[in-house]
Amino acid sequence: MHNHKVSGKQIVSYASFCLGNLGHSAFYGVMSTYFIIFITSGMFSGLNQSVADKLIGLITGLMVLVRIIELVIDPILGNVVDNTKTRWGKFKPWILIGTVVSAALLLILFTGIFGLAQQNWILFAILFVLIYIAFDVFYSLSDVSYWGMVPALSEDSHERGIYTSLGAFSGIIGWNSLPIIVVPLVTGVTYAVTGKHEEGAPGWFAFAAVISALAIICALIVCFGTKEKHNIIRDSAKQKTTLRQVFGAIFHNDQILWPSLAYLLYSLAAVITNGVLFYMYKFVIGKPNDFWVVGIIATIIGCCINPSFPVLNKYIPRKWLFIAGQTCMVLAYVLFIFGHNNVFLMDLGLVLFNINFALLVTVLTLTDAIEYGQLKIGQRNEAVVLAVRPMIDKFAGAVSNALVGYVAIAAGMTGSATAADMTSKGINTFNMMALYIPLALAVLSIVVFSLKVTLSEKKHAQVIEELKSKLAQGEIEKKTSVDTGTKEVTIYAPADGELMQMSSVVDEDGKPFPGKGFAIEPSSGQIYAPFDGTIKFTFGTKHAFEIVSQNGLQVVVHVGLGTVNLRGEGFETFYDDGQTVKKGDKLLEFDRDLALNNGYKDTIVIFYTQPGRIQNSGTIQAGKDIKHGEKVVDVQFK
């Protein structure tokens, strides 16, 4: 592996992208969690309570409907971004436009559409739907563009990982900073404007204005601090994903279905709880000024959990990490229910609630399910599979808004109500909907993951090996084209090293490597394209990829023997699946020393995935030293 030297421009790009999600994530927190709190507490102040409750129910229902519709229109918005062509690229315009417009619309919503609810609630409801739909569309355009921008910033998988990690890190800070500032800011501004110590409408507007301004500033930083690398090949490789494809993938692949269900149960519990914690501190505990503790604890734990996961996963299977995290969540609910009057127990509950690996485990399990599906049903659905988790998050967010609105009305936590106004019936209603239901969901997620998710790290390695054998023997990819006579492709060495006959290749367990092809005992860790062609797919472990020549020869370049167990560690790719490459283009680097030190071999095997089509595979000059780009063999096939 080469030593990554980071230039000044690269540091600016990293920092700019990182800061972008600081404001973006905080803005999402306002729209997904705190807007519903404003609706239930400040938007309809001054109206008759029964009328206000009806409007809260109506608006909440409309929000949920819009959020669910968003699941359908998201792919359309993705196409809008993909088809955008400007001198600034396709992503930056929508990051800025989406953020500015959604911020302006959010501010209008935080005014109660300029107090229209008190004048004409029917017109208010109509305008609310139109404004909220526009707001949601423009926010989604910004969101799709921000995360979709990563492949445009670098073709290096290592650098992409840095961008993603930095964005996730700043997102934790942006999201969790909201509980720290919301009460002081809202109550402070309200007192300055009205002289009342409460969370009033002026304070909520100021809160929304501050976060909206932050989001716009951060969007500008992304636009000016990063540079999109236009790549026609990358554009052509982009896959479009529909809601129908997502559900099709879920129901045809059980190891997508069950992890998704377990994650849905977790996500519902988590977003419901995050949505009601403010109500808990204000109405149940009676200490809204202590709500800042929620953000402090979540930030500290969140910044520790993500970096610790790879280390823990080296020694603890991810299934047990999922169960451990969910067990912590269950214990947190027990403390919330029975210990909410004790400061120490509440803080301990918040710590346990934030110790969770469900997101990371689910992402990795779904990624592994791509190869599982290829083996089971003969199809790879990368884009579809990776779209499952974000759609679950959006669905869970919609359900959370509905439940939070219902809880606030049913428990009497709307308008100007305070902790002193709470009845035992209201508290019991709150506990049932806000704590007992999420507790049951957390327990069910443990049951589903424990009993139904079988795709462990070890099982995935077995799937890869079986898939490799079937590919080499031509059992996975069948010939679909009509014969047009014999074709020929010249294969050039993808690496420096010594040529080997396929019959001489023995894996780390002493078993012969199946199929037709040849191998190279490498002298370096760089892998190059063996001919002009298109990258068809890459295993999630990055140790093997298939490349198809312009006239249809399908070849897998398999890097190392036993290296599947490294699970991508020590591998860096410099292409996108679906990308067209030229002979000699650098495609991959791998750490030979890491493979050898772990007891694996660094042998590079090149084999044909449709061996039945091969008519003449030429003669391999075994033992010959060869440089990448030098001719190895002419292959004739039908």
Curated annotation (Swiss-Prot):
Coiled coil: none annotated. One of its GO terms (cellular component) is plasma membrane. Keywords: Cell membrane, Kinase, Membrane, Phosphoprotein, Sugar transport, Symport, Transferase, Transmembrane, Transmembrane helix, Transport. Its EC number is 2.7.1.-. Induction: By lactose. It is found in: Cell membrane. The modification Phosphohistidine is found at H558. One of its GO terms (biological process) is phosphoenolpyruvate-dependent sugar phosphotransferase system. One of its GO terms (molecular function) is symporter activity. It is a multi-pass membrane protein. The chain crosses the membrane at residues 27-47, 56-76, 94-114, 121-141, 166-186, 204-224, 261-281, 291-311, 320-340, 343-363, 395-415, 429-449. It holds the Pfam family MFS_2. The keyword Transferase applies. Its main location: membrane. Residues 1-470 are annotated as: Permease. Residues 503-610 form the PTS EIIA type-1 domain. Responsible for transport of beta-galactosides into the cell, with the concomitant uptake of protons (symport system), and also for transport of homologous and heterologous exchange of beta-galactosides. In the N-terminal section; belongs to the sodium:galactoside symporter (TC 2.A.2) family. NCBIfam families: gph, PTBA. The PTS EIIA type-1 domain may serve a regulatory function, through its phosphorylation activity. This is Lactose permease. It comes from Lactobacillus helveticus (Lactobacillus suntoryeus).
